[in-house]
Amino acid sequence: MLNSLKIANTFESIKHEKISKQTVDKYINYFVDAFILREAKRYDLRGKNEIGALRKYYFLDTGLRNARLNFAYTDEGKLLENVVYNELIYNEYTVNVGTFESIEKDKDNKSIRKTYEIDLFARKGNRLYYIQVTDNINDATTKIREYRPLIMINDQVQKIIVINKPILETRDENGFTIIGATDFLLRFIK
């Protein structure tokens, strides 16, 4: 997944050279045209429309991505999210990155606006899914991070957590589907 603003900021902090977001966008568009990347627009889950400003990009061939990084990038959760995105697209789903805002109180009891993200919002006909993809949910911090947006968005869309473990499909106390990546990719979305 790529975000042009993050790339520009990272380039500046690591290489100590300024590159504009517009230049990064140009290069990303070249990669999209060359079928190296695919764009996933953000979708406001409460407003029910696409948000044009920020986008995520996924690699169409994760092997090329890994080769370019000398197989050194080890965030398996993000790589799995990329694979799940590609498989949904291959199976003719419309896929967006789900977002919504919430007004919350900070520690000083001041109202703050917070944006939450659901990894993938997939649609195909009358099939609608909110999908969180993670390497595992054994760690309490990870579990809270993955569950919180799904709990906060209170509608009838099926909520799924895809885990990079060989587990059988189950439902948890929230009604969320918990499923292993292999089962999800080979059976669930077909």
Please report, for each region that a protein language model flagged, where it lies by residue.
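Short acidic, hydrophobic short linear motifs in intrinsically disordered regions
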Residues: M1-F11
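Short, positively charged loop/turn segments that connect secondary-structure elements
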Residues: T10-T23
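A cross-kingdom feature that marks ATP-driven nucleic-acid transaction machinery
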Residues: Q22-K190
